[in-house]
């Protein structure tokens, strides 16, 4: 049967040697059945077959069968050398087998070289790899050889490349975000729009494939995730700086969590930025732990996105969830108009920030008990309330009281003298 399959391969392969890309799946599927035997027996036969079957099998059928033998014998390197020596009787087999050796020795380069346009090589590589994956056959590499190598390379590299680009972009963006939140919000949104537009242009071609590939390639995305995590873990230095910057802004953060859901609205559609941004969103709840903790109950119950509030210690899970959210929002971005998302985002981001800053100023004022001090200030009209409002949250309240009393005394003799 194997000899018949070899003869079938030899005839078909020689006859269709140019169209092997179309024909080889048939004989390769024929090979699938005896492939476990092919690897074992054909290695033995090839020595005999090469002398006997060469006129029939010609370069092609020997080359896949012996490529199979070669893969089978890659573990047994002395094997292919005599077969190769026997195969050198045909220059074509030598060429094919040399190519197949170069292709087949590294399996990874095989899958890549299977992409090589000469279908003879690619299909031989596929048939050999199919025989190597005897269960899968050519169907494993042939459709996927074109698809995953094509699409996975796109899925692997395109997400990889924009991720890397965005990582490079985000490091300054995050610095800007943390230095100036509002302007960085615009700046980040603008760049994110550009990035998302560029990414959309990329994603229009295989949107579903990429979603599937992201979900399937989370393991390979673990590399870009690893890149992001490495950058994000390298960012804790920046985060420490950022936390120092956010330290005085923490009252803003205590009020800002209502702004957070709007920001993740930015961040979720903004596809690759978010994991870092979300972490930066997440760490602010952490610094309040260092600083006044009562803000944490404010931040957590308030409508922050649940991932940053809970997995503060679970940033890795956060990153995974965020990547999933990214993937979901990537499709949402594909489906929804970006403007419909971004405009409310840009609109929502700033109104919360607008009131938040005065609220953040007002909250410490009320906490500092400015109202009685204001009452005392209202007595001496000479004291301008507006500059003192800035001073109010400071512990200057007691000296302000004493100053107000002094002012009252000074005014009272002035009034009496006048």
From Swiss-Prot:
<dbReference type="GO" id="GO:0007420">
    <property type="term" value="P:brain development"/>
</dbReference>
<feature type="short sequence motif" description="LXXLL motif">
    <location>
        <begin position="174"/>
        <end position="178"/>
    </location>
</feature>
<feature type="compositionally biased region" description="Basic residues">
    <location>
        <begin position="200"/>
        <end position="212"/>
    </location>
</feature>
<dbReference type="GO" id="GO:0045893">
    <property type="term" value="P:positive regulation of DNA-templated transcription"/>
</dbReference>
<dbReference type="GO" id="GO:0019899">
    <property type="term" value="F:enzyme binding"/>
</dbReference>
<dbReference type="GO" id="GO:0001541">
    <property type="term" value="P:ovarian follicle development"/>
</dbReference>
<feature type="compositionally biased region" description="Low complexity">
    <location>
        <begin position="311"/>
        <end position="336"/>
    </location>
</feature>
<dbReference type="GO" id="GO:0035774">
    <property type="term" value="P:positive regulation of insulin secretion involved in cellular response to glucose stimulus"/>
</dbReference>
<dbReference type="GO" id="GO:0006352">
    <property type="term" value="P:DNA-templated transcription initiation"/>
</dbReference>
<dbReference type="GO" id="GO:0007507">
    <property type="term" value="P:heart development"/>
</dbReference>
<dbReference type="GO" id="GO:0035097">
    <property type="term" value="C:histone methyltransferase complex"/>
</dbReference>
<keyword id="KW-0539">Nucleus</keyword>
<feature type="modified residue" description="Asymmetric dimethylarginine">
    <location>
        <position position="391"/>
    </location>
</feature>
<comment type="subunit">
    <text>Monomer and homodimer. Interacts in vitro with the basal transcription factors GTF2A and TBP, suggesting an autonomous transactivation function. Interacts with NCOA1, CRSP3, RBM14, the histone acetyltransferase proteins EP300 and CREBBP, and with methyltransferase proteins NCOA6IP and PRMT2. Component of the MLL2/3 complex (also named ASCOM complex), at least composed of KMT2D/MLL2 or KMT2C/MLL3, ASH2L, RBBP5, WDR5, NCOA6, DPY30, KDM6A, PAXIP1/PTIP, PAGR1 and alpha- and beta-tubulin. Interacts with ZNF335; may enhance ligand-dependent transcriptional activation by nuclear hormone receptors.</text>
</comment>
<dbReference type="GO" id="GO:0046966">
    <property type="term" value="F:nuclear thyroid hormone receptor binding"/>
</dbReference>
<dbReference type="GO" id="GO:0140463">
    <property type="term" value="F:chromatin-protein adaptor activity"/>
</dbReference>
<dbReference type="GO" id="GO:0046965">
    <property type="term" value="F:nuclear retinoid X receptor binding"/>
</dbReference>
<keyword id="KW-0804">Transcription</keyword>
<dbReference type="GO" id="GO:0060716">
    <property type="term" value="P:labyrinthine layer blood vessel development"/>
</dbReference>
<keyword id="KW-0805">Transcription regulation</keyword>
<feature type="compositionally biased region" description="Pro residues">
    <location>
        <begin position="282"/>
        <end position="310"/>
    </location>
</feature>
<feature type="compositionally biased region" description="Polar residues">
    <location>
        <begin position="399"/>
        <end position="418"/>
    </location>
</feature>
<dbReference type="GO" id="GO:0044666">
    <property type="term" value="C:MLL3/4 complex"/>
</dbReference>
<dbReference type="GO" id="GO:0005634">
    <property type="term" value="C:nucleus"/>
</dbReference>
<dbReference type="GO" id="GO:0042802">
    <property type="term" value="F:identical protein binding"/>
</dbReference>
<feature type="region of interest" description="Disordered">
    <location>
        <begin position="186"/>
        <end position="418"/>
    </location>
</feature>
<feature type="modified residue" description="Asymmetric dimethylarginine">
    <location>
        <position position="353"/>
    </location>
</feature>
<dbReference type="GO" id="GO:0003713">
    <property type="term" value="F:transcription coactivator activity"/>
</dbReference>
<feature type="region of interest" description="CREBBP-binding region">
    <location>
        <begin position="1"/>
        <end position="352"/>
    </location>
</feature>
<dbReference type="GO" id="GO:0002793">
    <property type="term" value="P:positive regulation of peptide secretion"/>
</dbReference>
<feature type="modified residue" description="Asymmetric dimethylarginine">
    <location>
        <position position="342"/>
    </location>
</feature>
<dbReference type="GO" id="GO:0005667">
    <property type="term" value="C:transcription regulator complex"/>
</dbReference>
<feature type="region of interest" description="Disordered">
    <location>
        <begin position="77"/>
        <end position="98"/>
    </location>
</feature>
<comment type="function">
    <text>Nuclear receptor coactivator that directly binds nuclear receptors and stimulates the transcriptional activities in a hormone-dependent fashion. Coactivate expression in an agonist- and AF2-dependent manner. May coactivate expression via a remodeling of chromatin and its interaction with histone acetyltransferase proteins. Involved in the coactivation of different nuclear receptors, such as for steroids (GR and ERs), retinoids (RARs and RXRs), thyroid hormone (TRs), vitamin D3 (VDR) and prostanoids (PPARs).</text>
</comment>
<dbReference type="GO" id="GO:0045944">
    <property type="term" value="P:positive regulation of transcription by RNA polymerase II"/>
</dbReference>
<dbReference type="GO" id="GO:0042974">
    <property type="term" value="F:nuclear retinoic acid receptor binding"/>
</dbReference>
<feature type="region of interest" description="TBP/GTF2A-binding region">
    <location>
        <begin position="1"/>
        <end position="215"/>
    </location>
</feature>
<dbReference type="GO" id="GO:0030331">
    <property type="term" value="F:nuclear estrogen receptor binding"/>
</dbReference>
<keyword id="KW-0488">Methylation</keyword>
<feature type="compositionally biased region" description="Low complexity">
    <location>
        <begin position="190"/>
        <end position="199"/>
    </location>
</feature>
<feature type="compositionally biased region" description="Low complexity">
    <location>
        <begin position="269"/>
        <end position="279"/>
    </location>
</feature>
<dbReference type="GO" id="GO:0030099">
    <property type="term" value="P:myeloid cell differentiation"/>
</dbReference>
